[in-house]
């Protein structure tokens, strides 16, 4: 902003005896403080932006407004004085308006330079004095009102005399009154329209106020962010050793800065758009107000002229009547006229003065409140305009009433004169009556009627008084002209302030852009610093030199701040003097106001009543506006809900990926369990090789185990299928939800674009916020993937990639703001890609399912092969039994004696064979049943696959709809793809392991078959042992058959339960599908109703637009009364329509809310159903776990020996001893760490105390400097200042610099000592940590040795248990003892893990203490450096003031001596800075330069 001051003034010269005035053209330079004067106006090409450029041949000289101490106005000849240190400029203008223009312009320029200062306390005194003056004015107004009331009473007493004559002419007056009422109705209608506009302006001002408050908050946030950036830079310079930690801190801070800056940019853009629109509306309305006010003023002037003409005719008629009546009536009429004129003039003057006072109060508040209270200024200015408009309207109404009264009086008096001419006798009688009444009421009037001589004397006195009052009126007219000029100047000030606000907004925008550029530069600098960290480690010596250079830079900054402090002190002194002048001027103006305001009180009561009416009307319109705002808030809440839904969708995607990972982990665990079961089978087969008698039993056991495993695998397959189904159903439901939500979003966006065209900027801001949030989510996903990978080596590369991504994102945001149309196209393309990626993921899931199915098929084929092998074994057994029978028959023939015995034995053998055959037949039938069941399940799988294919088709259709939105999920999907690829690779590895295990099992089975064949040959050799084997086989076969039957029953029960659960799950799925259909229908209905509501909202907006247009037409066509009435009727009809539409909207909103409640209830039912499903799945899992436990109990019945107990007890004792050692070591390490931390805290507290003492020393130095400056400024002459200041300054500067260097060196030394102590502590801690780790490793190795020994013992016991048969009770006791000991071992392992965790926590605490210590050191060093900079700035300001004081005094002396003085002071000051000359030599150097 720039202030304009231009024009001709007469300037008095300073040379010569006779000082004449010369006409000079004055113009204010662009810098706002150099007032140049010329012989004629300079050409436009010449720029006078500064004093150095203006020192050319064109400019005769200039006046520095910053150094002006006072402006005095001389009484006569339009002369005023401008005082500057060392000189007084005597200037003369042509009239008072030019004087006021130049004085107020200079004051405005001074205030413009004082706005940015923070001296608010000085101006509080002015506000208090003005408040006191206002209170005094109110008291004086009360006195004037009392006098006015007395005069009114007198006037009323005189009016009673003429009431008899007025009764005749009441009819004529009533007609005129009706006409006046019609006019008043028109005015009231206009006033109402004005009030409505005023309320809208107030609302706009409130919006501006809120927006500017938010802007101030964001400015504060920007300042905080810049401070954080400085802290980060200092941390980089100081902590070059901690590279990894610094990188992490820099990443976090950069992310936060970018997020906050993006938000601030968006909000500032919105605020600027709102402010621009509101300014335009406000300017239009102000122009309308001004036009209406001018129309009303013209009407009032016409009415006043008519009334004056009537009064003149009345006076002429009165002069023709008798002398007595003429004298009385002339006196009365003249007094009335004078009083009315005085009241009117006083009202106008008082209103203008009140306006000036209010404007000046606003100016003072503007000076007190800096940038944060600028917004409140606009509100106050608008409120003042509204008050003035209301006052003007009230005054207009009052004047109308008075004009009506005067018209009535004039009519009455004209009729009185006519009656007097017609009947003089009646007049005489009436005069007698009037004289009698006057004698009773007024002694003065009785004396006038009785004594003509006294009346003549009184007439002469009255004439003298009239002359005096005419002189007063002339003076008041002059004052009114001055007030009008002041009003014009105040209006110019308002315009200037509006321009200031716009310029400030532009400056803030520029600052934001600068901040963005600074942040980008910081990012580039950070990337460069990361590359240079390794170089800094190698070049520690060069870093110390850089620190010294930085200290020199800090000292330069301190000098600059000292210069600023000096300039601030000079401005404070100048302000004090200017404030005193302002107080004097205000006191003078207030005295004049007190003289003018003595006859004005009745108008205040009427104004108050009308103000109350206006306030009531304003409240009614405020309520209507609040209703509209509530509607807008509801729309905004809907937008926020849509944003929340998008965020929930993203979170659901992440959760689904996590669930897939967990399921894959569970599958891997199940595979491991299966591998362990296979190994247990191998051990059981090896154990059964020793006993040939139990071959049949072992075969049956293997068959049972295979069947159980088949069942387990079938259950697992079913679980996989169910899990896949549930996951697919969940995905489908989520996709449906997403589709519905996206449809709602699309419809809401379309409706909002139609309804809220004026709020496009806010929607752009919302889009940018969503983009920032998605960027945050992307960054979080990237960070999570980095943590999973745990690859710290790739951090530097990833940082570079992130920086590039951030830059690309910034460019994308800028492009999106410029081209919104391109966004939609890019969204569609990206969503198409998303759809393809989702299809790929679904294909991958299908491949996984197919792989699982293929693995299950392979397992089934292998089981079938094993079953065939078992059948071959049974057939071999049958063949061997047949051979035995043939041999027995041969022996029968050879041995006749033993036939009977052999027959008996043969019968027994035949029975056994039959039993075996029956058992084998049963087994075969069961195997056939199992195969049938497998085929049924295969059919189920095929049907399930077909259903999956159908669902896939549906999903593809749904995904085609999703292609329209969700551009921002690309990066998330890429991360998920990478994780899925890794999981797939892990699955492939595990599948390979499973295949290897299966091959190993096949090889082991082949070996077993070969061994079995060998042992069958041995059976033929051992015929003698057949009898014993038969007996044992009988007993064992019975036991095994009973067990087998029990197992079959359990299996059948469990299968029945599983079938029941499957049926229940199917029913629940049907219910779920039905509920989903209902939800979809409800959502469609809701969409339709939302469209209807949007259409109705559009209608309401159209109607509002029509209303606004009609109101504008009413304002334009104020003269046409009939048109106004028609428009009013139309407005009322439109308002009724609006109310009806609003009621319909409310009803539809209620219906929508009810449907939303129904949807929520359905969702709750769906949740309950899902919970029931989860409970049933848990029951299935429990059944399966129970079955697994029963099998494990059968396999875990093994024999153990008492020797194991002794060894385990010894192991227990050793472990306890080592635990005690670990505990003692950890306590010692913890105590050492605590003692070291206590030492560090004590050292930090000592350092804090030292810093506090140093800050006190610095504050004392500042006080000494200020006191010395005050003492020197109070000296009388400039020469004494030269002698006294220069040596003190040199000494003080040297002392301060020495003290600063000493303080900095001490701080450096103490920082180095503390860092060395911290390094020593860290080394000790690392040593203790390494020792503890070595001890823990030793303990773990010993524990592993014990475990290996226990395993070997277990294997030996197993082999021995085959040969021995201990009692079941002893076995159970030994098993219990072993299980207890294993639990104890596990507890010990847990304790070791907990202790290792505690050690890690201690390490983390120590690292945090180190970080906090470095942060505290940096903060304190920053504080000390800031204080040093402030001291240096003060010193620089003192130097600058000293230089300019000497240079100006020498320049004045040289001018008196006749030197040329062509050299500018500012150039000399720039040279002396670079030369480094002592203070003592400055005057000599300056004088030499001036002489050149």
From Swiss-Prot:
Intervals holding LRR repeats: 123-144, 180-204, 258-284, 329-351, 352-375, 389-413, 439-462, 519-543, 551-575, 579-603, 632-656, 728-752, 806-830, 831-855, 895-919, 927-951, 955-979, 1013-1036, 1044-1068, 1138-1164, 1210-1232, 1424-1444, 1445-1468
Coiled coil: none
Signal sequence residues: none
Domain PH: residue ranges: 2-111
UniProt keywords, alphabetically: Leucine-rich repeat, Repeat
Keyword Transport assigned: no
Stored InterPro entries: PH-like_dom_sf (IPR011993), PH_domain (IPR001849)
Region (Disordered): 1272-1292
Keyword Repeat: yes
Record field: compositional bias (Low complexity): 1274-1286
Short name of any one Pfam family annotated for the protein: PH
Gene3D superfamilies: Pleckstrin-homology domain (PH domain)/Phosphotyrosine-binding domain (PTB)
PANTHER family associated with the record: GOLGIN, LEUCINE-RICH REPEAT-CONTAINING PROTEIN DDB_G0290503-RELATED
Protein name: Putative leucine-rich repeat-containing protein DDB_G0290503
Organism of provenance: Dictyostelium discoideum
């Amino acid at each position: 902003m720039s202030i304009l001051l231009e024009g001709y003034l007469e300037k008095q010269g300073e040379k010569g005896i006779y000082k004449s005035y010369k006409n000079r053209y004055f113009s204010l330079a662009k810098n706002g403080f150099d007032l140049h004067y010329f012989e004629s106006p300079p050409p436009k090409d010449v720029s006078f932006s500064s004093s150095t450029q203006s020192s050319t041949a064109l400019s005769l000289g200039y006046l520095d407004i910053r150094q002006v101490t006072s402006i005095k106005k001389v009484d006569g000849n339009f002369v005023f004085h401008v005082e500057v240190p060392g000189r007084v400029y005597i200037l003369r203008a042509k009239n008072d308006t030019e004087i006021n223009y130049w004085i107020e312009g200079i004051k405005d320029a001074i205030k413009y330079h004082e706005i940015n200062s923070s001296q608010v306390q000085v101006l509080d005194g002015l506000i208090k004095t003005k408040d006191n003056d206002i209170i005094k004015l109110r008291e004086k107004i009360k006195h004037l009102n009392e006098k006015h009331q007395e005069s009114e009473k007198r006037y009323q007493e005189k009016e009673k005399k003429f009431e008899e004559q007025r009764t005749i002419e009441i009819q004529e007056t009533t007609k005129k009154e009706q006409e006046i009422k019609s006019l008043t109705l028109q005015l009231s209608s206009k006033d109402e329209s004005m009030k409505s506009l005023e309320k809208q302006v107030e609302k706009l001002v409130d919006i501006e106020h809120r927006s500017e408050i938010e802007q101030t908050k964001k400015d504060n946030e920007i300042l905080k962010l810049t401070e954080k950036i400085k802290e980060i830079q200092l941390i980089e310079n100081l902590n070059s050793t901690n590279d990894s930690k610094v990188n992490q801190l820099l990443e976090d801070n950069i992310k936060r800065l970018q997020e906050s800056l993006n938000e601030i940019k968006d909000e500032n853009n919105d605020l600027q758009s709102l402010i621009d629109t509101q300014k335009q509306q406000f300017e239009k309305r102000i122009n309308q107000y001004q036009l209406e006010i001018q129309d009303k003023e013209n009407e009032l002037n016409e009415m006043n002229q008519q009334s004056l003409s009537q009064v003149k005719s009345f006076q002429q008629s009165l002069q023709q009547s008798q002398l007595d009546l003429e004298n009385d009536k002339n006196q009365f009429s003249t007094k009335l006229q004078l009083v009315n004129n005085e009241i009117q003039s006083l009202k106008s003057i008082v209103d203008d003065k009140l306006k000036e006072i209010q404007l000046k109060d606003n100016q003072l508040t503007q000076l007190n409140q800096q940038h944060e209270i600028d917004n409140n200024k606009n509100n106050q200015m608008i409120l003042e305009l509204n008050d003035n408009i209301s006052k003007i309207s009230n005054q207009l109404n009052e004047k109308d009433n008075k004009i009506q009264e005067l018209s009535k009086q004039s009519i009455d008096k004209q009729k009185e004169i006519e009656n007097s001419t017609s009947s003089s006798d009646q007049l005489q009688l009436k005069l007698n009556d009037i004289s009698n009444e006057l004698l009773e009421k007024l002694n003065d009037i009785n004396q006038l009627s009785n004594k003509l001589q006294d009346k003549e004397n009184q007439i002469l006195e009255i004439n003298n008084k009239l002359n005096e009052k005419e002189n007063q009126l002339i003076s008041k007219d002059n004052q009114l002209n001055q007030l009008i000029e002041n009003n014009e100047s105040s209006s110019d000030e308002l315009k200037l302030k509006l321009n200031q606000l716009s310029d400030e907004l532009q400056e803030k925008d520029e600052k934001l852009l600068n901040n963005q550029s600074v942040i980008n530069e910081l990012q580039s600098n950070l990337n460069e610093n990361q590359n240079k960290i390794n170089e800094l480690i190698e070049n520690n010596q060069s870093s110390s030199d850089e620190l010294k250079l930085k200290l020199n830079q800090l000292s330069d900054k301190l000098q600059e701040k000292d210069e600023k402090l000096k300039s601030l002190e000079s401005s404070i002194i100048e302000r004090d003097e200017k404030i005193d002048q302002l107080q004097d001027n205000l006191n003078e103006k207030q005295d004049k106001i007190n003289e003018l305001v003595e006859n004005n009180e009745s108008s205040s009561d009427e104004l108050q009543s009308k103000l109350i009416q206006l306030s009531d009307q304003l409240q009614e319109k405020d309520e209507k506006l609040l209703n509209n705002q509530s509607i807008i808030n509801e729309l905004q809440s809907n937008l926020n809900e849509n944003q929340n839904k998008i965020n929930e969708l993203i979170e659901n995607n992440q959760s689904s990926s996590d669930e897939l990972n967990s399921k894959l982990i569970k599958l891997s665990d199940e595979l491991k369990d299966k591998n362990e079961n296979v190994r247990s089978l191998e051990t059981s087969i090896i154990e059964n090789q020793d006993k040939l008698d139990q071959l049949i039993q072992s075969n049956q056991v293997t068959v049972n185990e295979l069947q159980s495993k088949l069942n387990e695998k079938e259950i697992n397959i079913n679980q996989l299928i169910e899990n896949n189904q549930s996951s697919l159903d969940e995905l489908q439901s989520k996709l449906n939800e997403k589709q519905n939500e996206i449809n709602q979003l699309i419809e809401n966006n379309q409706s909002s674009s139609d309804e809220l065209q004026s709020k496009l900027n806010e929607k752009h801001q919302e889009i940018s916020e969503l983009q920032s949030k998605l960027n945050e989510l992307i960054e979080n996903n990237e960070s999570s993937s980095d943590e999973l990978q745990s690859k710290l080596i790739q951090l530097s590369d990833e940082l570079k990639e992130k920086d590039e991504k951030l830059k690309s994102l910034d460019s994308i945001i800028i492009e999106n703001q410029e081209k919104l149309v391109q966004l939609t196209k890019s969204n569609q393309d990206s969503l198409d890609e998303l759809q393809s990626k989702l299809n790929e993921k679904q294909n991958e899931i299908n491949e996984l399912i197919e792989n699982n199915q293929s693995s299950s098929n392979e397992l089934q084929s292998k089981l079938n092969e094993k079953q065939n092998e078992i059948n071959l074994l049974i057939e071999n057994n049958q063949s061997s039994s047949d051979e035995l029978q043939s041999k027995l028959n041969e022996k029968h023939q050879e041995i006749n004696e033993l036939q009977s015995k052999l027959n008996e034995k043969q019968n027994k053998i035949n029975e056994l064979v039959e039993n075996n055959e029956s058992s084998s037949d049963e087994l075969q039938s069961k195997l056939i049943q199992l195969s049938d069941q497998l085929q049924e399940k295969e059919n189920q799988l095929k049907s399930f696959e077909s259903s999956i294919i159908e669902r896939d088709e549906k999903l593809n259709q749904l995904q085609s709809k999703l292609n329209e939105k969700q551009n921002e999920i690309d990066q998330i999907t890429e991360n998920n793809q990478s994780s899925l690829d890794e999981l797939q690779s892990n699955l492939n590895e595990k599948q390979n392991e499973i295949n290897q295990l299966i091959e190993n099992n096949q090889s082991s089975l082949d070996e077993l078959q070969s061994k079995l064949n060998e042992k069958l040959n041995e059976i033929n050799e051992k015929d003698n042992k057949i009898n014993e084997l038969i007996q044992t086989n009988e007993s064992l076969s019975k036991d095994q058959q009973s067990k087998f039957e029990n197992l079959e029953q359990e299996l059948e029960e469990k299968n029945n339960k599983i079938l029941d659960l499957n049926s229940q799950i199917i029913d629940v799925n049907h219910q779920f599908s039905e509920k989903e259909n209902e939800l979809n229908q409800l959502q469609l209905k809701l969409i339709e109703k939302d469209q209807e509501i949007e259409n109705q909202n559009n209608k309401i907006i159209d109607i509002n637009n029509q209303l606004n247009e009609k109101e504008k037409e009413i304002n334009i066509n104020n003269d046409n009364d009939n048109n106004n009435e028609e428009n009013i009727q139309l407005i009322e009809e439109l308002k009724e329509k609006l109310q009806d539409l609003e009621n319909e909207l409310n009803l539809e909103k209620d219906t929508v809310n009810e449907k939303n409640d129904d949807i929520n209830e359905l969702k709750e039912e769906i949740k309950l159903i899902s919970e029931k499903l989860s409970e049933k799945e848990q029951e299935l899992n429990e059944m399966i776990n129970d079955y697994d436990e029963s099998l494990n109990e059968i396999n875990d019945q093994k024999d153990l020996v008492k020797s194991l107990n002794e060894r385990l007890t010894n192991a227990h004792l050793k472990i306890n001893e080592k635990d005690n050692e670990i505990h003692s070591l950890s306590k010692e390490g913890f105590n050492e760490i605590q003692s070291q931390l206590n030492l560090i805290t004590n050292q930090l507290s000592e350092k804090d105390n030292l810093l506090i003492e140093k800050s006190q020393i610095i504050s004392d130095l500042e006080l000494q400097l200020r006191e010395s400056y005050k003492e020197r400024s109070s000296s009388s002459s400039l020469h004494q200042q030269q002698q006294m200041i220069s040596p003190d300054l040199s000494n003080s500067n040297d002392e301060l610099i020495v003290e600063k260097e000493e303080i900095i060196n001490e701080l450096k030394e103490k920082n180095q000592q503390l860092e060395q102590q911290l390094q020593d502590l860290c080394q000790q801690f690392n040593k203790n940590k390494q020792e503890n780790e070595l001890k823990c490793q030793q303990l773990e190795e010993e524990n592993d040795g014990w475990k290996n020994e226990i395993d070997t013992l277990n294997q030996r016991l197993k082999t021995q248990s085959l040969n021995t048969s201990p009692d079941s009770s002893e076995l159970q006791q030994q098993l219990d003892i072993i299980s207890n000991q294993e639990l104890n071992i596990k507890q010990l392992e847990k304790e070791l893990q907990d202790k290792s965790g505690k050690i890690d926590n201690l390490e983390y605490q120590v690292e945090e203490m180190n970080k906090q210590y470095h942060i505290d050191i940096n903060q304190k060093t920053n504080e000390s450096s800031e204080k040093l900079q402030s001291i240096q700035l003060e010193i620089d300001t003192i130097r600058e003031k000293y230089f300019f004081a000497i240079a100006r005094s020498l320049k004045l002396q040289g001018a008196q001596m006749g030197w040329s003085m062509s050299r500018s002071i500012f150039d000399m000051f720039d040279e002396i800075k670079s030369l480094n000359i002592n203070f003592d030599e400055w005057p000599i150097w300056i004088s030499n330069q001036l002489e050149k």
